[in-house]
Each structure stands twice: as C-alpha cells, then as structure tokens.
Amino acid sequence: MVQHELAAEIARQILLGFDDYREHFRLITEGARARFEQAQWQEAQRASAARISLYEEKVGETRRRLLASFDHADLLQVEAWPQIKSAYIELINPRFDDELSETWYNSIFCGLFSHDCISDGTMFIHTTRPAVRAHERLAQTRRYRPNGDLRGMLEQILRDYAFSVPYCDLPGDLQRLQTQLCETLPDWVCKDPELTVEVFVSVLYRNKGAYLIGRIFTCDEQWPLAIPLLHRDGQGIVADALITDEAEVSIIFSFTRSYFMVEVPIPAEFVGFLKRILPGKHIAELYSSIGFYKHGKSEFYRALIDHLANTDDRFVMAPGVRGMVMTVFTLPGFNTVFKLIKDRFSPIKSVNRANVIEKYRLVKSVDRVGRMADTQEFADFRFPKAKFEPECLAELLEVAPSTVEVQGDTVLVRHCWTERRMTPLNLYLENASEQQVREALEDYGLAIKQLAAANIFPGDMLLKNFGVTRHGRVVFYDYDEISFLTEVNFRHIPPPRYPEDEMASEPWYSVGPNDVFPEEFPRFLFADLGQRRLFASLHGELYDADYWKGLQDAIRQGKVIDVFPYRRKADRN
C-alpha cells in the first residue's frame, strides 16, 4: 500500500496538472472579448480549435510527469488508488470547479490503467460533489427592474455590457429590442410591477457573435432571455435581437453548435442557471456547450448507467437504412445513438478504419455551424448482456466482431461514438405533409450550403445521412466521407464526344479521386421525382460546379460567413 504521504503527493501532482489546464483554458477564453472587439474571426476559429485540443494535451503532459516523478511500482499499483482518490477529494473540496477536477482525475487514471481497473473505489464513476454548494461567492448575475420604463432598462443593460467598440445605432437597437420584448411576451408581463430581468455577468462568445444570456421573471412565471450582439466591422456593435422563446434559446445552445467561450468561475452554478431557463436540456449538453466537453461526457455516462439501472430499456438497432461503414444501435428511452465502425465496409467505400476515426475526430474541432451533430468518443463500454435485444446483439457481433465481444453476462464495446438521436431525413420525408416536405428540403439545402461556407463538404449527401431534430432542423450526422471544401475538385461534366457516350455504362471522361460533378447530384440524391424537382427550385445552384468554386474562392480569401443560430426578424446590414 502506498504511504499516506506518497498518496497525497500523487494527488497533489494530478491537481497541479488540472490547475495548469484550467489556466490555459482561462487564457484562451479570456481572449474572446478582444477577438470580438477587433473582429478577428479567423483567430477566433483557431482559438476554438486550440481550446478543444488543450484537454488531451494537458492530460498527456500530466501523465508523463507522473510517470517520470514516481516509482512505477508505487504509481501503477491500482490497489493504492482508493487512498490517492481520498487524498484528492480533500484537495478539491474547497474548489469552485470541483466537479471538473473529478473528471480530470478520471482522465489521468484512464491514461495510466486499463479499463479493467475502473471501479468507483479508484475513480469518480459517481460524483462525490454535493448538489448544493455552500461556498460564499460573488453574485453571478445582474438584476434589472424596469419600473415602468422598459426602454430605460434595456439601455442600462446594453451600457453595462458595453465594449471598447461603440454601438452602431443604440437608439435603433433599443427600439427593436423593446418591440421584440413586447411582441413575444404576454401583454400583462411588460406592465407587471414585479417584472425582473436577470442577466449572467459574463458574456458568451462564439464564432462572430456575442450573447447576453439570462431570464425574465415575475412572481409566477419566467422566460429565458438571449440578446445576440454582432460586430459589424467598421460600423460598430449591433444588438441584433431579443429572444424569449425557449425553443429558440435552446437552439442557441444546440449540440450542433461550436462551444461557447465564456468566463465561468463556478461552472456548476452557471450550468444550474442554464438548466433553470432551459429545463429540456441535459446537464451533459450544457457543460459541453460552454467548452467543458469532457465533463459533459462524464455527465452523459452517469445518466446512461442510471437509465440502464432504473428502466427496462434494452438496446435495439437504430431505425433507418443500414450503413456501409458504421452500424448504429440505440436505447428507445434514451435520446442517443451508439455508432460502431464495421469490420468490413461496402466495396464501393474507399475509406478505412483509420480514415473514419480521423474524420469523426475532425468534427470535434471544426465550426459545426449548427449543421453537424456533436459526438463523444468512448472506449471499453461495458453493458449487461441482458440489456440487449437478441437480434441487436447478434447483428453487432456479426458486423463488428473485433469491436463487440460477449464476456459472460457482459457485452464489451471496445470503441464507439455517441450522438444525439434524430429522425433520419429519408424516413421523415416518407411520413411528412406537403408543407413539411418543402420545409425539410429547404433546410436540407441550407444545411449543405452552410456546411460548405464553413469549408466542410459532406461527401455523401444522401438523405439517409441527415437527420431532423426535435426543433425541425436538418443536421448532418454521417462523417466518414467529409473533407474540407477546398480539397475538392468541382467539375462540369464534359460534353459527350459521340451520341453513344451518353448511353455507355462508363463515363467518357476521366475522374480523379477528389473530383465531384454537381450535375450528378439530382439522380443520386432523389429517387422521388417530385422531391427532385422541388429541391431544384429551392437550391438549384447546388447542381452547378461554378457555385461551389465561388465558395472555395471566398474561403481562400479568408472570409468567415455569418450563420445565425436564431431567426432574424429583419435583414440588417
């Protein structure tokens, strides 16, 4: 058994690594304000990617330092880790980010030991943190009362959150915000003498936007509040909208968006605040939305094992067309799919396992523009065999035997990704009304365009590779063929040399590995002729190679597009 002093020193070194990670995380996040004020959009993209990769970098550094600092016979003695865990708990008890430090400890442990060594005695499978914290702390929100003057209250809010760059048209912004506030809330609310607006003290930054997040409440009711702010380069700051609809605010925090940059000294308190105004959001998703995606993964896992322990739910194959590269299963009562790489791919697929892993990891670091589902990667999941429907387990063992193994009463899944479950677009269209079909196809085209403008080409754009969220948004979720748009060679189909060319089974022109012919999209994407014609009327430019080349030129010139995670009331330039 490791001596108490040695256990305490190992725990201290683990926490020092966490402090180093948190400091670098804070510095990157803190720079978001200056990047917004200076309209440094490409720098913002680089900072976002750097912050995502920071966690694994710092875990690796800490692991190497531990291995260099301690005798391996002591450090790698798994029986000693309950004592190390106890020493660590004592160290993190006074912290404001204690729940994150538990996840950090877990990452270090998993970097030193195989998953066979995982237990609640050696790791924080279940949190030891109290639901209610007793820390004394500074207020995390600011409160405002209109006292009959809504415009004056809104002006005070905007002035309290002013930037080094002035507002472009403050009177116009105030008029717009007041109008939207009165239009979206019941008449009596704006006249209620108890009306209060509470705004989180830190501004949230993402891509080209900044957001004030809070709530509006009376004695009996509350509404979420989001005020998006834009920086029009050369013009100033614009308060673009005032949003109180829960579904719309929820979309701003969607699993399809990049992570916010926001200074949160007490993460649990901010997440609790978000949970109060967005009760439909899971804690895991909220932690991920503000950049703590590893802790989001911890919260997801805890929710999953709790669901399995307390329900009769059993794993089944996910609905939809079977994939050529991935196999997908799900729990009907748990809004998630589990994706495994098959042992053998369809012959028409030119990717390999390493390519697929690379593509899925790429999605984590790029701007998803609200059109790609976030993923979490897991290794060595263990589930009770009784939790699988026999048909599901049989199919998994058939198509992914190197990944799925039955060990007695347990099923070992060596590697998988989790994603939010959505309705596959092809299945959605089968049961949709005429209006729903039109709206879905319009959003499908917008999804492709917005991904392309963010330098992402989906590769396989078949309807089955897109899903429809509970808010009706179309989202791409099959990443094995994605690439950067600038890597693709878009071409027009050359005219046939002879009339017989058009009847031949093989093309009369050469095709390179990165060549894409948009004129071929209609027959590949739509078997339904009505849908094919409708999509052509909505997004016909997607069939033109010159459209794609124009996007490539804009990207190479360093242009960063505006993609708004909310409905804009009017177009304001």
Swiss-Prot record:
GO terms for molecular function: [isocitrate dehydrogenase (NADP+)] kinase activity; AMP binding; ATP binding; phosphoprotein phosphatase activity; protein serine/threonine kinase activity. Signal peptide: none annotated. Keywords: ATP-binding, Cytoplasm, Glyoxylate bypass, Hydrolase, Kinase, Nucleotide-binding, Protein phosphatase, Serine/threonine-protein kinase, Transferase, Tricarboxylic acid cycle. One of its GO terms (cellular component) is cytoplasm. GO terms for biological process: glucose metabolic process; glyoxylate cycle; tricarboxylic acid cycle. Pfam families: AceK_kinase, AceK_regulatory. Its main location: cytoplasm. ATP binds at A318, P319, G320, V321, R322, G323, M324, K339. The active site is at D374. InterPro entries: AceK_kinase (IPR046855), AceK_regulatory (IPR046854), Isocitrate_DH_AceK (IPR010452). It catalyses: L-seryl-[isocitrate dehydrogenase] + ATP = O-phospho-L-seryl-[isocitrate dehydrogenase] + ADP + H(+). It is found in: Cytoplasm. Belongs to the AceK family. PANTHER family: ISOCITRATE DEHYDROGENASE KINASE_PHOSPHATASE, PTHR39559. HAMAP family: AceK. This is Isocitrate dehydrogenase kinase/phosphatase. It comes from Stutzerimonas stutzeri (strain A1501). The gene is aceK.
